[in-house]
UniProtKB/Swiss-Prot annotation:
Homodimer. The lineage of its organism: Bacteria, Pseudomonadati, Campylobacterota, Epsilonproteobacteria, Campylobacterales. The keyword Zinc-finger does not apply. Belongs to the ABC transporter superfamily. Macrolide exporter (TC 3.A.1.122) family. This is Macrolide export ATP-binding/permease protein MacB. One of its GO terms (biological process) is response to antibiotic. It comes from Campylobacter jejuni subsp. jejuni serotype O:23/36 (strain 81-176). SUPFAM superfamilies: P-loop containing nucleoside triphosphate hydrolases. Disulfide bonds: none annotated.
Length: 641
């Protein structure tokens, strides 16, 4: 079963083992005896594949161990070797049953099978009443029996016992030795390390070692051969194995988080703030953008203004005129929903003893709908008003507020105001326009454009033509077509256009840029939180080094250890993300309750993005600590206090 030839182990210039050669047959009960520093524990660690010899040959069950990789050695420990340690090496967060079941988890056995086997083993060792007890609730003898049960969980063809009675009282020590003798009688191969000759005398073969060399090798009787040993087959990673690994990792991660509540919460704080920031920033951006777009919609969506000149501020624009012929040409275009004229002039509005600087806006019937103006009382202009150049006016909110400060809108209908000495009957009052990007204090009277031309300015030319494009038509294509048609009609391009969609796109682009910049701040907060997670995971690896060594000793592969700490990092980040989302929902609710300017809009995609990014942060910042844990040397890890 075990064949060692010329095994040497050097640490620096110190020779721990010197050309050790021995063979152990299956079913033997061997005691390796020697004083402290003799090399007996180093020899046991090499036999148990926890350590690697500096030179020599080691064959276990027809496999040359010195040529196996780390995962193959882990499989050998998992399937054929059981360890019994002097200090028990039970995981403090797990119950007795869970500790015993652990090797079967890494072997890919199902939960029910693991549970039944663990109960049977503990029952055989008279611990049926301690299944759910944690190690700190057990006596030393009971803990050692749990350790023995764990060693037998996957069969334990070879039991390696390192000073198994060293930390026990004499009664418990005798019980442990009796258990080992019974196991040997059943066919298990036992290799026991001790410094006590009385304990060594219980074995059927005693090997004495001193200063790294074998002094004597005494056999008492032939070895038992009751076990039918299996040769190692190629390991397959089944779905059950992966499920068991993941479940165990989640359980350990959850227990670890609960065991250090305050530390875990402080670690999550960075993630919570980062995720809440991401969700709130997106909600704020969506809310403000929706408000602006709504305002633009009320100001007039898909609208195009045509004005004389080559652009805003053109000094020669006064020499250029738009006329009714241009207006009729545009009205004939089928892709335009509405077309109307617009002119204005400044003057003085008077009512009784109140006189104000004001502007008369000469508009048509469609202008109110095109510009998104909403009536508060009365009516808007109709076709008869425009056709007959009637002296009627619709006051805006500023005009009503300044000319009739203490009266309701409906009470001033029918009254007459003067504009540049011309009387105008009030037929309507507009609502306050809260959707303008920039609020102004201009007093406006909306009158028929024909009235403005015929009775106020005498100018038959139009200052502006405003059109509304149909919803199913691209405003950009419509604008290009209008420019081309008017250019052909007028013989030159002596006019310019302003498309409301250009303003809308500029606002949207500006909001997008602002959102991206603010999101960058939130991402930085997430990264800071991720660094906090990495820091605490490094601390966790340092604190749990011994646990890692124990898991490796019972057969955990490096990928099992790595998965465990990665899942723990991801779990911390995910819980932090969920708490961050909950916090953001409260913030959004509070903001929407207290603020009337614009709402914060919770977006499902931002929540999903937050959760996914937190998992990504967990993987990225958990990888380095997890890799450190997976690369630990089992012997160094087990010796860590």
């Amino acid at each position: 079963m075990i064949f060692l030839k010329n095994i040497c182990k050097n640490i620096g210039e110190n020779a721990i083992l010197k050309n050790v050669s021995l063979s152990i047959e299956k079913g033997e009960f061997v005691a390796i005896i020697g004083q402290s520093g003799s090399g007996k524990t180093s020899l046991l660690n090499i036999i148990g594949t926890l350590d690697t010899p500096s030179s020599g040959t080691y064959v276990f069950d027809e496999y040359e161990v010195t040529k196996l990789n780390n995962d193959e050695k882990a499989r050998l420990r998992r399937e054929k070797i059981g360890f019994i340690f002097q200090r028990y090496n039970l995981l403090s967060l797990l119950s007795a049953k869970e500790n015993v079941s652990l090797p079967a988890v890494y072997a890919g056995k199902k939960l029910q099978e693991r549970s039944q086997n663990a109960k049977k083993l503990l029952n055989d060792l008279e611990l049926a009443h301690k299944l759910d007890s944690k190690p700190n609730e057990l006596s030393g003898g009971q803990q050692q029996r749990v350790s023995i049960a764990r060693a037998l969980m996957n069969g334990g063809e070879l039991i390696l016992a390192d000073e198994p009675t060293g930390a026990l009282d004499s009664k418990s020590g005798i019980m442990v030795l009796e258990i080992l003798q019974k196991l040997n009688a059943q066919g298990h191969t036992i290799v026991l390390v001790t410094h006590d000759p009385k304990i060594a005398a219980q074995a059927k073969r005693v090997i004495e070692i001193k200063d790294g060399e074998i002094l004597s090798d005494t056999k008492k009787e032939k070895a038992q051969e009751k076990l039918t040993l299996k040769t190692m087959s190629k390991e397959k990673k089944t779905l059950t194995l992966l499920k068991n690994q993941a479940f165990e990792c989640f359980k350990i991660a959850y227990s670890s988080i609960l065991a250090h509540k305050l530390r875990s919460i402080l670690t999550m704080l960075g993630i919570i703030i980062g995720i809440a920031s991401v969700v709130c920033v997106v909600a704020l951006g969506l809310g403000s953008q929706a408000k602006v777009l709504e305002s633009i919609a009320r100001l007039g969506t898909n609208t195009i203004e045509i004005r004389p000149g080559r652009g805003f501020g053109d000094l020669r624009s006064g020499k250029t005129r738009l006329n009714f012929s241009d207006l009729e040409t545009l009205r004939s275009l089928e892709y335009l929903e509405a077309v109307d004229a617009h002119s204005n002039t400044s003057g003085v509005a008077t009512y009784t003893n109140i006189s104000l600087s004001a502007r008369a806006e000469g508009v048509g019937v469609n202008n109110f709908a095109i510009e998104g103006l909403r009536i508060d009382a009365g009516r808007i202009l109709n076709n008869d008003d425009v056709k007959n150049s009637t002296n009627v006016a619709v006051l805006d909110f500023n005009a009503k507020k300044n000319l009739f400060p203490d009266e309701k809108s409906e009470n001033i209908l029918g009254r007459v105001v003067l504009f540049n000495s011309q009387p105008f009957k009030i037929i309507g009052v507009l609502q306050k326009d809260t959707d303008k990007p920039i609020e102004d204090n201009v007093v406006r009277l909306y009158i028929p454009y024909t009235t403005l031309m015929n009775k106020l300015t005498g100018d038959r030319n139009l200052r502006e033509i405003i059109v509304k494009v149909k919803d199913d038509v691209s405003s950009t294509l419509a604008e290009n077509a209008i420019i081309r048609i008017l250019e052909i009609k007028r013989g030159q391009k002596d006019f310019f256009t302003f498309n409301s969609d250009t303003f809308k796109q500029a606002i949207t682009a500006n909001k997008r840029t602002t959102t991206i910049l603010t999101a960058c701040v939130a991402v930085i907060a997430l990264i800071v939180g991720g660094i906090g997670v990495m820091n605490i995971m490094l601390v966790s690896v340092s604190e749990r080094t011994r646990e890692i060594g124990i898991r490796m000793a019972i057969g955990a592969r490096r990928e099992d250890i790595m998965m465990q700490f990665l899942i723990e990092a991801v779990m911390i980040c995910t819980i932090g993300a969920i708490l961050g989302v909950i916090l953001s929902i409260f913030v959004i609710f509070a903001f929407n309750t207290l603020s009337t300017d614009f709402p914060m809009i919770l977006n499902a995609y931002s929540v999903l993005l937050g959760l996914l990014s937190s998992m990504f942060i967990g993987v990225v910042f958990g990888f380095f600590p997890a890799r450190n844990a997976a690369n630990l040397n089992p012997i160094s890890a087990l010796s860590k206090e």
